[in-house]
Amino acid sequence: MDNKVSASPRGSYRKFLEHLSGAGKAIGVLTSGGDAQGMNAAVRAVVRMGIYVGAKVYFIYEGYQGMVDGGSNIVEANWESVSSILQVGGTIIGSARSKAFRTREGRLKAACNLIHRGITNLCVIGGSGSLTGANIFRMEWSGLLEELAQDGKIDNEAVQKYAYLNVVGMVGSIDNDFCGTDMTIGTDSACHRIIEVIDAIMTTAQSHQRTFVLEVMGRHCGYLALVSALACGADWVFLPESPPEEGWEEQMCVKLSENRAQKKRLNIIIVAEGAIDTLNRPITSEKIKELVVTQLGYDTRVTILGHVQRGGTPSAFDRILASRMGVEAVLALLEATPETPACVVSLSGNHAVRLPLVECVQMTQEVQKAMDERRFKDAVQLRGRSFENNLNTYKRLAIKLPDDKIQKSNCNVAVINVGAPAAGMNAAVRSAVRVGIADGHKMFAVYDGFDGFAKGQIKEIRWGDVGGWTGQGGSILGTKRILPGKYLEEIATQIRTHNINAILIIGGFEAYLGLLELSAAREKHEEFCVPMVMVPATVSNNVPGSDFSIGADTALNTITDTCDRIKQSASGTKRRVFIIETMGGYCGYLANMGGLAAGADAAYIFEEPFDIRDLQSNVEHLTEKMKTTIQRGLVLRNESCSENYTTDFIYQLYSEEGRGVFDCRKNVLGHMQQGGAPSPFDRNFGTKISARAMQWITTKLKESPGKGKRFVSDDSICVLGISKRNVLFQPVAELKNETDFEHRIPKEQWWLKLRPLMKILAKYKTSYDVSDSGQLVPVRHRGGPEEPAAI
């Protein structure tokens, strides 16, 4: 294999995909165990990436059972075999739990079937059981080959030629129960299904003043129950990893009746299917219902969500995750040597990593062992930083301490929304208000952005005022794009009048510019010498200092859903190309990631300049595509990608150049991208990042015991962002150099590295820098104290 590298300007070496060849290799791809949404996206990525590098790729139908049975269950795939499957839930190649593969005879048959097709590279998409099976198969491989040779089923030449089996795993499981991975394929989509059901149930529960007990899947892992409880603001949640303390029955009934007393018309209780008490006895949804009915007399209903959670369309997150994992899996197989251990490709923050399969499985089994031995604190820690943080955040927001038990700080904190509306803003406000109150502050809501601030539209906001805000789209406080520059005097007066000691700004690029203006005004107005922090919230995802913004995931899902419908329309019409315009200002995040999630043929963005030759090349590419069985095209265009190559221009060009081959339609998605109920990701991201911002404010205010302290240092006016896996508070003054103010985007954007991935999956030859790939990372049990906790 010609694995060349080239020297980069920094002196390190860079590795490019075009230097990796799969010629002469055969890859088998199978899905095993329970199905999960997004598996098809992973299969598609493996097949297309495999073909792209010159390897043969085989579908192994019906999981390990198909491998044992052989025959028509192992079929060579081509480019078109995986067309139109991105948006389909489940797995098109079937999945089964195989008893035969658990026996040596079964594995012997499987090895024979693979050898006859020259397959020595396996890509397994499944849970921990499926991946463990693959590793056992790999360990036994040479012994199986020798046995087959002795039985005369293969010759000695084949034993030499196919001496090693390479195995790469991708975790496809809605439970998110695999240690070492931030998110498994299917988890985000399962959260979507749960939240869709909860949102629907809330309307009927409010109408009748009912209590609903919802049972969610996850076997012995409480991840789905926990994140859905956080995303809907459930009254109580039962998890296997963190059982309720003795006397929980009475505590729960008190909590439910308190909420009813505060005019809350419904109660939601979420139960993980593996929920237990501290003595490892099961807690069932029926038992909880009986308790509520007998103790409180509430009209109570049980809803068991069941296999609804496995079904439906994969979310944008799962499609992108699975596509990235599929490509990374093929790279791992190409680079594998006989000494390379079986690995799992996974996501850490927004980075693809490879982890040793055996270590991950052992650690996953340790969680179950800890639960069996009733070491529940250890079980929560072994689940990872993210799980622990989710649990702590849920507890802080769900349970209000009595007023006499909260130590008052005598500080007033203002919360304000700035910029365009973004789904998840309200979840962020709710979280900030409740964490602030729990920390002893008085919380003030500022209505209608800086405009409202100047006019004195400021009101104290209490714990109960923000109940039910998590699932609301848009901005309840109201938000405007107006900057504070021309209202500095008035805003300073309002800060003085209401004695504001700190400000939390939730918004987009305008909020960032506003923060810079307030920072510059500190010299003239001492009122602005208070801690200020901004939480990024914009569909455009263009705020410097953060890889993600609240609202971008919801917008991405809206774009993906719309593209799915449009593709279906184009499939029915045949020979039709759709040009779709997305929002984002000059930032191409939505167009690029939407293109990856929807399976677009091209995506035009400002960050990658294009000319008429590129447009011509795309038209020719689509003309060739129309000669195949896939007679439709999808092209995304960011609204500000080019001053002259407008959506109308591109539409007219495609219409003229494609005359006689395909016809063309255009669709401007517009403000629908800002609306709708927030996705589970945006609800929880908003909740957690806002809680972290309030913790920072509390810490800063504690630095100033006297009333007179003025905050003038740069580190007292920050943007809170996520970079890779870390939560960073970055002074706005430092972020200036990282910002392209003319185009309102950061100078460096992480997602541009994924740009070639979309092109490869759309059958374009391109250069792809894979320098970040290839490191086998050890599985960490816990992050050290110096490592910032994951959001």
UniProtKB/Swiss-Prot annotation:
EC number: 2.7.1.11
Keywords of this entry: Acetylation, Allosteric enzyme, ATP-binding, Cytoplasm, Glycolysis, Glycoprotein, Kinase, Magnesium, Metal-binding, Nucleotide-binding, Phosphoprotein, Transferase
Activation/inhibition comment: Allosterically activated by ADP, AMP, or fructose 2,6-bisphosphate, and allosterically inhibited by ATP or citrate.
InterPro entries according to UniProt: 6-Pfructokinase_euk, ATP_PFK, PFK_vert-type, Phosphofructokinase_CS, Phosphofructokinase_dom, PKF_sf
Binding site for ATP: 34, 97-98, 127-130
Residues that, per the record, bind substrate: 173-175, 210, 217-219, 273, 301, 307-310
First-listed, main subcellular location of the protein, grouped into a coarse class: cytoplasm
Chain positions recorded as beta-D-fructose 2,6-bisphosphate binding sites: 481, 538-542, 576, 583-585, 639, 665, 671-674, 744
Interdomain linker: region residues: 400-411
Gene Ontology cellular-component terms listed: 6-phosphofructokinase complex; membrane
Region C-terminal regulatory PFK domain 2, annotated ranges: 412-791
UniProt-recorded name of the protein: ATP-dependent 6-phosphofructokinase, platelet type
Organism: Oryctolagus cuniculus (Rabbit)
